[in-house]
């Protein structure tokens, strides 16, 4: 048989008399036929670019919203283009990769990892200009108002999804996070306020006590300033 669709197992094939593959139009409908005549279904093309090919028929369709293709998630805007960078959807913040230096960038959704959307800004004027976020592994939404342990460090993400930086009070505890949002635990911090120490377990600022750390004894006053004894 020639010039017809055939279902074999879970796959759909198009048998053509001239062996056509790639982008083809059949009865006014667009399809993508790969090697051996297999019809692409339930994804974008191999370059992860729209249009989207229907899950069942393989017909090119206009699709909007979240779309899964080759195991990765994307968001299609009303104009048919993929979302790029940070995007608020239904009150939640998402991030779609957007590296201007990568010509193969596909704008896939970031899930289950830390991300700095403006990572290509090598030397921002302020740490706050290049915030760190964590995007949930299941939904891809930026987590808010919670601690997250990622890449060997603790972070706390505020109500806007940004990792807290520097001196912060979280749940009544005085904590410190570096310029990337990593929580300081079991270490000293020195700045215009003096030298302070943050507990190795809780990360809380040590105050009003004497401690021996790495063989050296210090007294910490009411605001945490260390004085070597």
Q: What are the roles of these predicted feature ranges?
A:
Residues 1-229:
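Extracellular adhesion/carbohydrate-binding repeat motifs centered on closely spaced tryptophans
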């Amino acid at each position: 048989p020639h010039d017809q669709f055939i279902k074999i197992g879970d796959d759909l094939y198009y048998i053509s008399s001239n062996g056509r593959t790639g982008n083809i139009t059949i009865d006014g409908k667009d399809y993508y036929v790969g090697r051996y005549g297999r019809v692409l279904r339930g994804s974008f093309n191999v370059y992860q670019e729209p249009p989207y090919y229907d899950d069942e028929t393989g017909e090119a369709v206009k699709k909007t919203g979240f779309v899964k293709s080759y195991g990765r998630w994307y968001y299609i805007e009303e104009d048919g283009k993929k979302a790029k960078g940070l995007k608020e959807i239904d009150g939640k913040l998402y991030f779609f990769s957007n590296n201007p230096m990568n010509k193969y960038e596909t704008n896939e959704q970031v899930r289950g990892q830390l991300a700095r959307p403006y990572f290509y800004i090598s030397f921002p004027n302020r740490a706050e200009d290049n915030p760190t976020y964590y995007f949930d592994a299941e939904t891809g939404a930026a987590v808010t108002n919670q601690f997250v342990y990622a890449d060997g460090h603790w972070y706390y993400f505020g109500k806007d999804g940004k990792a807290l930086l520097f001196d912060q009070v979280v749940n009544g505890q005085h904590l410190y996070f570096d310029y990337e949002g990593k929580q300081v635990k079991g270490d000293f911090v020195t700045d215009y306020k003096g030298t302070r120490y943050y507990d190795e377990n809780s990360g809380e600022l040590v105050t009003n006590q004497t401690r021996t750390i790495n063989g050296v004894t210090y007294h910490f006053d009411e605001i945490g300033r260390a004085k070597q004894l």
